[in-house]
Structure formats: structure tokens, C-alpha cells
Amino acid sequence: MSDSQEIPYHNQLKNRFRGYFPVIIDVETAGFDAKKDALLELAAITLKMDENGYLHPDQKCHFHIEPFEGANINPESLKFNGIDIHNPLRGAVSELDAITGLFQMIRRGQKDADCQRSIIVAHNAAFDQSFVMAAAERTGVKRNPFHPFGMFDTASLAGLMFGQTVLVKACLAAKIPFDGKQAHSALYDTERTAELFCYMVNHLKDLGGFPHISQIDETENTAENQTAL
């Protein structure tokens, strides 16, 4: 008997989000236009589910990125995120290397979890998704694992659960420590967003909100039918 057969249906990651593999993303940029402004930093964290159905952060990657040729650089954006694009200690790589490394990590995790496609999880997710997709298009990297427009927005989810939409306030509501001095570092924000998303998913489970009673009945009926066959 395989591991997936031994673990209850709703305690398998592939069955939690309809076959989607959730990946936490955060980007730091030189503006708001994903087509024209530079992508300067990117971090991602994949998730795993334990045998009891609880979600946890798993693998991570982090890249400082060189502005693509002809990219706009908004000085106000650099002042906001504190990035010095001319600092050689950044260790910046090309967009091609960053997106290639990101997709390789995600495809491995997606395969291991037996999921069919990946989905971006981010705080104000439309922003992060637009920059990742624009970079993927510019670089021509094949086999983009992400759904082209679907996403999970932790700002919306936190607004529903806590009445808070700002990342730091949502984290504090979930009793997740947040160091404001490290905010707007892509890796730090991704780590906190991953903790927040896992907390919300796990808390819903603890409250009895997932699986829903209708899903439990449906799963049991499916299992009975398979046994009968």
C-alpha cells in the first residue's frame, strides 16, 4: 500500500486545493508596471502537508535580480524597498536564471506532491503574479507551472479571518512575530506570508471548517463505491 493510500484523503496536499500546489511568492520591484519596471528580488516557498492534514513551509529559493535591458527604474520605489541596484554584494542574477531556478524548484515539489498545477499565494497577489508572469514571458522559460490567472491572496483571506489586510497586522493577529525593520525584503516577507497562510488553513481545520461535512460524505461515498467495484 502506498503512502498516499494510507493517509486520509483530506490530509493529502493534492486534495486540499483541488490539485493545485500552493507556492508562496514575494517580489520587490522598481515600480508598479510589470511589463516596464524592473523585477529586482524574488523569493518563493513551497508547502507540504503532514499526515494529520496540517500545512507547513517546505523548500525555499531567493534571488536578487539584475534589471532587464531597458527596464524602468523608479527612484521612489528603490527608496521604499531600500534596494541598491548598483551594489555588487547583491549577487544579482539574470531574470532568466531566477525564473529558471524558481520553476525547477516548483516543478519538483509539485511532482512530489502529486499535484497537477501550481498556484501563486501572495499578499496582494495580483501584483506579485503580474511580475512573475511578465518575467516568465520576457525570458521565454518553458513549462510555467503556475495557473495563468488563478491565485490565493492572503490579504483577502486575512481580511476575512482577522479583519486585517496589512501583512504585519494580519501576522500579529495570528500571533506571528513580525520585524518591521526586515519588511520589504522579499525573503522575509515570503517567510511571514507562508506562516500566515499555513496558520489560516490550519486554523480553519481546527475549527472544523475543513473538510466540510458535505465533502466528508462525498469522500466516504466515493470510497464505498471503489470498494464495491
Curated annotation (Swiss-Prot):
Co-factor: note: Binds two Mg(2+) per subunit. The active form of the enzyme binds two Mg(2+) ions in its active site. The first Mg(2+) forms only one salt bridge with the protein.
**Keyword annotations from UniProtKB, A to Z:** Exonuclease, Hydrolase, Magnesium, Metal-binding, Nuclease, tRNA processing
Top EC class of this enzyme = hydrolase
Protein EC = 3.1.13.-
- Locate the site labelled Important for substrate binding and specificity: 32, 80, 127, 149
GO BP field: DNA replication proofreading; tRNA processing
Which molecular function GO terms apply here?
Answer: 3'-5' exonuclease activity; magnesium ion binding; nucleic acid binding; RNA exonuclease activity, producing 5'-phosphomonoesters
Cite the InterPro entries for this sequence. Answer: Exonuclease_RNaseT/DNA_pol3 (IPR013520), RNase_T (IPR005987), RNaseH-like_sf (IPR012337), RNaseH_sf (IPR036397)
Say what the protein does.
Trims short 3' overhangs of a variety of RNA species, leaving a one or two nucleotide 3' overhang. Responsible for the end-turnover of tRNA: specifically removes the terminal AMP residue from uncharged tRNA (tRNA-C-C-A). Also appears to be involved in tRNA biosynthesis.
On subunit structure and binding partners, the annotation says:
Homodimer.
Task: Write the protein's name.
Answer: Ribonuclease T
Q: What is the lineage of its organism?
A: Bacteria, Pseudomonadati, Pseudomonadota, Gammaproteobacteria, Pasteurellales
